[in-house]
């Protein structure tokens, strides 16, 4: 007798899977979930999944370093773009800031704060530098670390700025892409997965931020407190965050 086909995993199955059962193939092309009173889909990234993805990205960076031993175009410096690039940047630092291979240079990490978008897919009239570049990039091969590349605006702006500071080759490093956009000043892109353009990614650094921004939006579109709670549960929010923030945000947000 034929064995029954295994049941396809649902969105919530993937979100709640324990660390040792992380499905790497799913997270290369993940799908979000629909909720009431919103046109966007939402994709909740658990902490351990964020760590897993950064590890896979670090492996790609290491492979890039090995492939460029002879070209002398190995990455020696990396710029984390705040705020989004801080979490993946710190996770990458754990893998790449030192090395046991004498042919692979350790990467020096720094930061730069840039605001390019007012909201998802909504670029500002002019990008703003919020925090100055913290490391010297003159004549260096530089990795630019972001959490997500949407239209490519931030990455392109930062790459152009770094080149104005004397940087050589620019390599974009990001866990997720929505598109490569019009990236004119970047030689190579290292990433892990693609997400659809209609999907709002909720990384571990912005769980509360997303909740306090989206709950009032749902409320103003007719959602009750109960509907907002159902939305958050459907997205994958843990009960402790819902208990702390939902009612206060709904009533005063």
For every predicted segment, state its role:
Residues 1-253:
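PRPP-associated nucleotide enzymes
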